[in-house]
C-alpha cells in the first residue's frame, strides 16, 4: 500500500492537524470542495499565543469539516518535557546556552495523540502543514506510522494541484474570501513562530539571515531583556525536586505538573530566561537558524543540574551528558519512542534522576544572567569538611597524599616515554617553543 499520497483521495476521510490559521483553513475548505471528507483535529499544547482553543474546532466545522475535535495534549507534553530534563536530552548548545528541544517534544506528543484520535474515528489518512524542507515532515511521518500501521499520508503542500491553485498566502486569503469567509490575513511578521507551553520557536524569513538578531523578535513567553528601557528587577526563586521530579516553586507545592510548568514559565519569563540563538543541523543535514524561548524549562534545568553535580560522581555525570546529547539527537530526529531512545531514557531516569532530591535557590536578573544562592539536599556527596583548608580532623593525611602521588610516577614515566616517541617520528617538536620544551635536554642527559 502506498504510504504517501501525491493527490487528494476523493471520497475518503482525511484527518488534518488543524491550527485555525490561514494555511490549514484554506486546505480544509479546498479538500471539502474537491470531494474529500475532512476531519479536523486540534492539539491543545498550551500555546502561549493562542487565546481561544474552543473556537478552533468551531471554525473547522464552518469550513466544511465532517467533525472537529480538540485534543488536550498538555499533560503528556509536560510529562515528556520533564523526562527530557531528567535525561539532559538536549544536544544543541551555543556558548553555554541550550535549546531545550521544545518543538521536537511537541511533535512527539502531537504526532501520537492526534493520530490515535483519528484512529478512533476510523480515519486512516493524515495531513498536516509541514513542508518538505523541514524536520516536522519526517517527525510526523515516523510518529504517525508508529501509532497507526495502516496510516497513509496526504499533505496538500505536496500536492501539485493544491499548489497550482493556492500556492501562496495571498491566493489562500482570496480563496477564503471568494467562498464567503471574511478571512483577513494576519499582519506579516519578519519571522515565523511556532509554540507550545514548553517553549517557542522563531525562525525563517528575516531570521534566515545571520545579520538579523534576537532584537527583531517580540518574545511571547518572556521580555526583551536586551532593551535597557525594560525594567527587570532581580528576583529570588526556589525550585524543589523529589526523586528527579519538580514538585515546588517558591515553597508552593504543585500536584498538577501543567500548573507547575505554567508557573515556571511565568517566573522565568519575567526575566527572559532560557532565550537562545542557535545554528543547528536539520535531519536532512542542512543547517538552519532559530531563536528559542523556554523560560520554565530553563529554570528547571538549571536547578536540576545543580543538584546533579552535587549528588552524583564524576563518571555518572559524564555519562549523563554523553547519553543526554545522544538522546537529544534522537528526540530531534523524531525517534523519541524508538528502542534506542527508550533504553537511554530508562537508564538516565532510573540511575540518575531517582537520586535528585533537594532545593536550589537562584537569583534571576536579565536574560540568562543568574546566580545560584543555595543548594540543599539530603543526598549531597559534596561535603565541605572533606577538603576544608582550615585546620581540623581530616579523612586523609599528608602521608596518604604522598603515597597517592608516588603511585602516579608509573603513568608519568609512561607518558614521558610516549612524548619522546612522538618527537622521534616528527609528530611532536622538541624545540623550546613546543608544549614540552625540556624534552630534548632530558633526552641528552639520558633521563
Curated annotation (Swiss-Prot):
GO terms for biological process: argininosuccinate metabolic process; L-arginine biosynthetic process; urea cycle. It catalyses: L-citrulline + L-aspartate + ATP = 2-(N(omega)-L-arginino)succinate + AMP + diphosphate + H(+). ATP binds at residues 17-25, 43, 129, 131, 136, 194. The keyword Ligase applies. PROSITE patterns: ARGININOSUCCIN_SYN_1 (PS00564), ARGININOSUCCIN_SYN_2 (PS00565). InterPro entries: Arg_succ_synth_type2_subfam (IPR023437), Arginosuc_syn_C (IPR048268), Arginosuc_syn_N (IPR048267), Arginosuc_synth (IPR001518), Arginosuc_synth_CS (IPR018223), Arginosuc_synth_type_1_subfam (IPR023434), AS_cat/multimer_dom_body (IPR024074), AS_multimer_C_tail (IPR024073). Keywords: Amino-acid biosynthesis, Arginine biosynthesis, ATP-binding, Cytoplasm, Ligase, Nucleotide-binding. The keyword Transferase does not apply. One of its GO terms (molecular function) is argininosuccinate synthase activity. Its main location: cytoplasm. PANTHER family: ARGININOSUCCINATE SYNTHASE (PTHR11587:SF2). This is Argininosuccinate synthase. It comes from Escherichia coli O157:H7.
